[in-house]
Amino acid sequence: MTSRDGYQWTPETGLTQGVPSLGVISPPTNIEDTDKDGPWDVIVIGGGYCGLTATRDLTVAGFKTLLLEARDRIGGRSWSSNIDGYPYEMGGTWVHWHQSHVWREITRYKMHNALSPSFNFSRGVNHFQLRTNPTTSTYMTHEAEDELLRSALHKFTNVDGTNGRTVLPFPHDMFYVPEFRKYDEMSYSERIDQIRDELSLNERSSLEAFILLCSGGTLENSSFGEFLHWWAMSGYTYQGCMDCLISYKFKDGQSAFARRFWEEAAGTGRLGYVFGCPVRSVVNERDAARVTARDGREFAAKRLVCTIPLNVLSTIQFSPALSTERISAMQAGHVNMCTKVHAEVDNKDMRSWTGIAYPFNKLCYAIGDGTTPAGNTHLVCFGTDANHIQPDEDVRETLKAVGQLAPGTFGVKRLVFHNWVKDEFAKGAWFFSRPGMVSECLQGLREKHRGVVFANSDWALGWRSFIDGAIEEGTRAARVVLEELGTKREVKARL
């Protein structure tokens, strides 16, 4: 089925909005009469991985649960579109067995053999292309590419002589060493200034492109401490970063994974749902919560799990008012305004290509990520807020940015993308914090507010902003509700 989300361009059709996805849910609701179908034990707002995990856990535990989702699909900021037999990851892609929460679910759903590697250096050009200006390129082997980035990242992270292990020994407890707060408050640019004399020109260009790929922001507004947190979660090594961040994906796309959560919850017979249902306001007390949708429909439950992303929370009216700490974080928002563009290109040898075009190009980092059924190469390309592009507003500019990654080597047969910056239900891509934001706001964002549990990957303790972090948070939220409402009697009886 086709979602309203996403864009596709081909030379024959031009730009069209809406792409097919396994995540589209039809019919869009199984609720005919809110009074008849209620009352609900729990309402979950948001059908991303956090909301899906909470919904699955609560329905399996015996609770009558209502899922409200603004979109026409599940997955939130992590979903895929299958076009002509090939999955394009619109947001969220890579997973790894070092990400314990997501791997628990992969084994639960017997999908351990459903992964494929993004990189394939077995044929084709088999090189890395570094472009620091529009007219020249430096080519090197992938081994040299690894050494270049490894050297640069080790210099960047080595604030303590141990590549961050001393100042951040427990990544899930970031401020176990109080000194770490100063790194949370430090920007990328401030850290680069400290090591500028140690970096070669190629190291600096590659480093800046890579870390901006991670944050989606600018050198000035991205927290160095947040990158150190990613680094620590990856095992404090360059290879760990590459393995955990950009190496392994689902053969059939993220939405195939999300469907497993959905189908298990629906199979309990305790799931109600309404898609295309943006929320306008939430009124909550200690033992009840009432949600009003934009169209005026009202829903009530004993507890509410709110999984709305940080950059969207300010669009919802909460009564009683939220804490000043949470409001401050909502008003500031995270910095990630990443652009992610998929390009199907007619050069099959680009499958083993990787490249950086920075700082001049609006897409700064790309890799050969697969081969389509037509025999073309799939490139996944990223841009950041440092040199931003709105890919749907000027396709010619987008095509130019793709072409500038490796000029004269391919023709573009298809573009596929989701504009996360203009998406009213995301207002940006994955979470990445401003300097000082985590130390100031993380705890406040995680606090319960009367009958409402706030849960989202944006404030996870571990793989924050990742699918793993979303599952971590959904698990936590469901556990809070279970502890407060107790185990349902009918489930205990079956046990």
From Swiss-Prot:
A motif (Microbody targeting signal) lies at residues 493-495. It is an enzyme of class 1 (oxidoreductase). Its main location: other. Residues 1-23 are annotated as: Disordered. One of its GO terms (cellular component) is peroxisome. Pfam families: Amino_oxidase. Residues 1-19 have a biased composition (Polar residues). GO terms for molecular function: monoamine oxidase activity. Its cofactor is FAD. InterPro entries: Amino_oxidase, FAD/NAD-bd_sf, Flavin_amine_oxidase, Flavin_MAO. It catalyses: a secondary aliphatic amine + O2 + H2O = a primary amine + an aldehyde + H2O2. The keyword Flavoprotein applies. It is found in: Peroxisome. Belongs to the flavin monoamine oxidase family. This is Monoamine oxidase N. The gene is maoN.
